[in-house]
Amino acid sequence: MKNSYFIIHGSFGSPFVNWVPYIRKEIEEKNGVVYTPDFPTGVGYQNYDNWNKLLSVYLDAGLINENTVIFAHSIAPIFICHFLVEHRVKIKRLVLVCGFNNYLGIDEEYDNVNETMYFDNLKDVRNYADEIICFYSKNDPYVKYEAEKEFADTIATEQIVIDDGGHLNSESGYTEFTELLKYI
């Protein structure tokens, strides 16, 4: 069976920013089926329950399964880990970019919307993905290196550390992210 792909944006993001359009285009050019849900963002809207409701529509339609590859950025890695563990959904591969859990200190607005995504059983996600690849940077301006490394050390089957990558978003020059292509 053919793989399906999901790309999940981060806090206050959308499917139209950072490297999301680039990866989507690359998958589509290989005739892949790719979904880029536009999750609610902002204080009062961006929370685990709202994101869970939206992604559950895809799950209930049978679109998230053992042939699914999920790319996720920033707060989205912990969201998708939480989602897979809660729903006990097995997928093929997680490609997580700048993931973290239980980290506060970005600023009050980000901390408030991110906190609902966190959960205690992070290592359990290893039961629900055949591969977990974590990309992160040594100089992320939003999340401390130690928080991203701890996240990756807990779950990753492979880690890629980029020395000067910032938050691996468009502000850091990542409108294209060629290192992700090998995981399509």
Cite the ranges covered by each PLM segment.
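Active-site nucleophile loop of the alpha/beta-hydrolase fold
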Residues: 10, 39-42, 95-105
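Short beta-strand/loop motif that positions the catalytic acidic residue
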Residues: 128-129, 133-136, 140
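Catalytic histidine-centered segment of alpha/beta-hydrolase-like enzymes
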Residues: 45-46, 165-177
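Active-site catalytic motif of lipid deacylating hydrolases and related acyltransferases
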Residues: 2-64
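Gly/Ala-rich beta-loop-alpha elbow adjacent to hydrolase catalytic centers
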Residues: 71-81
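Catalytic histidine neighborhood in serine/cysteine hydrolases
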Residues: 32-35, 153-169
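Conserved alpha/beta-hydrolase fold motif
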Residues: 69-71, 94
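Conserved alpha/beta-hydrolase "acid-adjacent" motif
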Residues: 141-147
